[in-house]
Amino acid sequence: MDLKSLIREVPDFPKPGILFRDITTLLQNEQGLRYTIDRLTQAFSDQAIDYVAGIESRGFIFGAPLAYKLGAGFVPIRKAGKLCAEVHTVEYALEYGTDRLEIHKDAIHTGGRVLIVDDLIATGGTAAAAAQLITLCGGDLVSYAFIIELQDLGGRKNLPDVPIKVLVEY
């Protein structure tokens, strides 16, 4: 299946000069969504994953069903201030300024094997911050999975040296 054909391109969003890759059209397509989850499941079914960590918010969309299919737990990595118990926090750089991600301190058991999932990798800043959170919890980052990679932005070079699965490259 050609997943790229199911991803809408929106020019000049969220600002002029940006070509936004909109996955809502992929999500609306029953066959496309099923194919996406099935491809990710096949890629990691032999990895003994304990937890799938989804990055807010679109990482939740793919992470939860993937965790279910892999027989793993799902762990949300949230923007600051959204979790109710004790958290680990990591600050990371944005194009202009910084942001913070958080995870519950008790989300992952020591040595737990973790797969981080998000919809897209661009510069890699958010995904790298998520890896730091996994380490703070005592987890073992096994791999990353992204639906889309924007290759020109070089995000891979900012990530830990673990396997990366990408379904669509631009």
UniProtKB/Swiss-Prot annotation:
UniProt cross-references to Pfam families, sorted A to Z: Pribosyltran (PF00156)
PROSITE patterns: PUR_PYR_PR_TRANSFER
GO function terms (MF aspect): adenine binding; adenine phosphoribosyltransferase activity; AMP binding
EC class: transferase
Keyword entries, A-Z: Cytoplasm, Glycosyltransferase, Purine salvage, Transferase
CDD domains attached to this UniProt entry: PRTases_typeI
Pathway(s) annotated for this protein in UniProt: Purine metabolism; AMP biosynthesis via salvage pathway; AMP from adenine: step 1/1
Name of the protein in question: Adenine phosphoribosyltransferase
Record's subunit section: Homodimer.
Reactions performed catalytically: AMP + diphosphate = 5-phospho-alpha-D-ribose 1-diphosphate + adenine
GO biological process, alphabetically ordered: adenine salvage; AMP salvage; purine ribonucleoside salvage
Native source organism of the sequence: Cyanothece sp. (strain PCC 7425 / ATCC 29141)
Annotated Gene Ontology cellular component terms: cytoplasm
EC number of the protein: 2.4.2.7
The gene coding this protein: apt
InterPro entries: Ade_phspho_trans, PRibTrfase_dom, PRTase-like, UPRTase/APRTase
Role of this protein: Catalyzes a salvage reaction resulting in the formation of AMP, that is energically less costly than de novo synthesis.
Chief place of localization: cytoplasm
Localization: Cytoplasm
Family (UniProt): Belongs to the purine/pyrimidine phosphoribosyltransferase family.
